[in-house]
Amino acid sequence: METKKLITATDTQYSGILLNALNDQRIQGLYCDVTVIVEDRKFRAHRNILSACSTYFHQLFSVAGQVVELNFVKADIFAEILNYIYSSKIVRVRCDMLEELIKSGKLLGVPFIAELGIPLSQVKSISGAGGKDGGTDAPSNPDHKAPEPQKSSDSPLPCTVKIKADVKTEMPVITESFSLSSDDYKDKKASGSQDHNSEKEDDDDDVIFCSEIVSSKQAPAERKEAAQTQIPPDNEQVPEVKKVTPSSQVQLTQNSLPTNQQSSKNTSSTTQKFTPPVNANISKNPTPAANGFLSPTAQKQGTPNAVQNQHSQNITSGNALPQQKPVVNFSSIKPQQISAIKPKTEVIIHGNGLSPPSSSVIPLGQQPVTPKHISFDGVQKKQVVTFTQGSPSKPGEFKIKIADVVSGSSLDSFKDSEPRRIIDGKKIITLDTASEIEGLSTGCKVYANIGEDTYDIVIPIKEDPEEGEAKLDLDGLPNRKRMKLKHDDHYELIVDGRVYYICIVCKRSYVCLTSLRRHFNVHSWEKKYPCRYCERVFPLAEYRTKHEIHHTGERRYQCLTCGSSFINYQVMASHIRSVHSLDPSGDSKLYRLNPCKTLQIRQYAYVNNSTNGTVINDGAINVPVITDGGINVPVINDGGIVYDIDPDEPQQPASEGNHANSATKPVNWDNIFIQQSNQNMFKLNTSEGGTEFEFVIPESY
């Protein structure tokens, strides 16, 4: 049978070209489906791009609409973050903005910007300690990423991090490409570019922050072990290590057994006896699944660790790698001394074995870590897990690794911690403090996801629009609040039997749903209320009503003392204070608000005296004149010139848009007002018993 060859091709420049194309679309405003408002500045972006790079937007966009307003980030800072998201670079940022940039990156859940201060502090330590011992202050992190195939010093690819301990005056060289050699591997954590490439490889939407505090006593030992990674050529285990490629850096996933029993059975015979305390060490998998890391602490005890592998590739000899840095280290730790961080793929770890179906599982160490909150599948939270093995004496002696994990150890720790609940179709994370909820009861710690001190968010998922109130999945938890979502503009929060409609943008609560709908037009900019007399459109009906008063000249505010009417409250209040010497804001009711009559104003012509025959017009205010001698209706052209019309002669054609009325026709208001959008208004004042017209010049709204 003829064999066929399978060809695989990879475009290495595709990711960069795609990112540049998306950035060009954002700059041109093409296909942007979300608007982020920061300090009166609007940023157009793509929803999927922001959610892929920021955990905050990933959670927010599940409930937010097309317009999002952020009040905890500065506009110039957010512009830099947005440029990084679309270009993967931070270019020419001022030093005084760096601290605010890192803070905003933590709030928005952008891992690279959030961790930017760590490599910068380590670079300072390396440069400052150049005269001492060549980079002692920079803690090595050999377990953060498995080394790529070892390259010689004349490798054609430029090295991202190149810090040699024996050269005291050499500064780190950071370039755009990524490669590591055995000499550079020991100090690669000191560069921010490695974090940048790591972010490109395992950038995930849902992340959790985990950190391990390494004591200062362990840093020199780890640095010394990292320096011993160079292996003589006659070592037969070197080819096994060189098989670690970016596509499969650790053979653990392919060779480990799928069940816990088989893993424990195979590893019990090959696991050596180690001196506690020890930590498990697993190299980072570049796939965007769950990843984790811990630094080994048993190396300083003088006992070599062997790579545990359960299949044909035998890297299990305890004496085969006396000085080589192991790729994967396991230790026989008692199960009750491990608090496991388990990914969503239900990977289970034991003290003597490991069975990962698709991703790695990390035992955290000798002392169990009880997280403050227990998260479940579908709920993400920013959380920093601190280990009590030692306190760092220097700012660079701790490591942060981004991993998509679900923290948890047992049901007992879940009962002790603050309850977290999964509701049918909803993901709920309660706030830590009730003080952030204003206007509601203390038991209602649900909403408010836009704020500097807010790290949790309520995520209701719209699955069934006709479904009623949600039900709790877990038993034994107090039903303090219920929540449902039928629309994308508000939450429906039920507290103590009362329903609150909460705006998803500004978190204002309303008792009436129609009031919230009118309010949300301010955020969505859906101007649904056009003016009846001009082209302006308003988001709220009350805004339109205040504006239309200037067109109609209607006086709705009436003084009860003298009966005078006024156009607005301010004029009426001034009248009451000056004329009647009374306080309109007192207990007694001194005015009345009449209902709006919505007078339809038309463009009017002139009524003048037939004996006079001419009305002088300056082109500014058109004055209708009614006299006893007779009634004549002239017309006006665009230049403000009035043409007299003799009532005994046929009517002459007027300028375009204007029509003259016959003098024999009885005069009424419909003859005076002619349809045209004119801004000059008047109001007939009948309070003084005469036919005097008072003119109101429209005010700009």
From Swiss-Prot:
Q: What is the effect of changing residue 47 to Q?
A: Abrogates interaction with NCOR1 and transcriptional repression
Keyword set includes Transport:
no
Q: Where is the BTB domain?
A: 32-94
PROSITE patterns named among the record's database cross-references: BTB, ZINC_FINGER_C2H2_1, ZINC_FINGER_C2H2_2
Supply one GO BP term.
Answer: negative regulation of DNA-templated transcription
Polar residues bias spans: 245-258, 278-311, 652-664
Could you tell me which residues belong to the region Disordered? 128-158, 181-311, 644-664
- Major location, coarse class? nucleus
> Where is region (Required for methylation dependent DNA-binding) located?
470-609
- Recorded GO terms, molecular function? beta-catenin binding; DNA-binding transcription factor activity, RNA polymerase II-specific; methyl-CpG binding; RNA polymerase II cis-regulatory region sequence-specific DNA binding; sequence-specific DNA binding; transcription cis-regulatory region binding; zinc ion binding
Give the span(s) annotated as Required for sequence specific DNA-binding.
Answer: 519-701
Q: Write out the entry's keywords from A to Z.
A: Developmental protein, DNA-binding, Metal-binding, Nucleus, Repeat, Repressor, Transcription, Transcription regulation, Wnt signaling pathway, Zinc, Zinc-finger
Self-association and partners: Self associates. Interacts with tcf7l1-A, leading to repression of tcf7l1-A target genes. Interacts with ctnnd1, and this interaction may inhibit DNA-binding. Interacts with ncor1.
Protein name in the entry: Transcriptional regulator Kaiso
What does the record give as the organism's lineage?
Answer: Eukaryota, Metazoa, Chordata, Craniata, Vertebrata
